[in-house]
């Protein structure tokens, strides 16, 4: 365990976009998709540490209206998720990645055989000579995150009151 990894007892919160990550009240795997951005592929799924001292301030700076949906997930449950692909495991690690203005910031990192999966995963899948089935595996492991996340869906206003 490296110094930035979070302990299994911690919770993290993922704020989700109701337009692209929820359909008819159901959380979609897209809520946990790594995206390709103009400045490069995402390396982790953005979350906030629920028990961090700055959590309420940080999350309210992100959602000033306090009405966005969010899900609370236990780090221990996240890190128990595993999926085997081509004799290598896909696993999650949750690490603190604080910034100057958002100190409760953390990320859910996806690894394949010890390599961080970035964006659509081409970087890791090419290292292991894994082809077209790779997208299927990424969706399958994201569905496991959905199973954890859908247990505790709430709103920013509700979670800040807790």
Which residues does each PLM region occupy?
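Glycine-rich short-loop/terminal segments
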Residues: 1-43
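Conserved NAD+-utilizing ADP-ribose enzyme module
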Residues: 2-8, 36-43, 51-162
């Amino acid at each position: 365990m490296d110094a930035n990894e979070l302990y299994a007892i911690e919770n993290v919160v993922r704020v989700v976009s109701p337009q692209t990550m929820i359909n008819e009240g159901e959380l979609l795997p897209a809520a946990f998709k790594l995206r390709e951005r103009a400045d490069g592929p995402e390396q982790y799924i953005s979350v906030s540490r629920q028990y961090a001292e700055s959590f309420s301030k940080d999350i309210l700076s992100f959602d000033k209206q306090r009405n966005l949906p969010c899900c609370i997930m236990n780090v221990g449950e996240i890190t128990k998720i595993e999926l085997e692909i081509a004799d290598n495991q896909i696993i999650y690690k949750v690490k603190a990645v604080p910034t100057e203005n958002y100190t409760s910031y953390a990320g859910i990192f996806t690894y394949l055989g010890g390599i961080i999966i970035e964006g659509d995963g081409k970087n890791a899948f090419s290292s292991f000579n894994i082809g077209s089935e790779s997208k299927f595996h990424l969706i399958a492991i994201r569905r496991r995150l959905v199973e954890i996340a859908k247990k505790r869906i709430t709103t920013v206003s509700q979670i800040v009151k807790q």
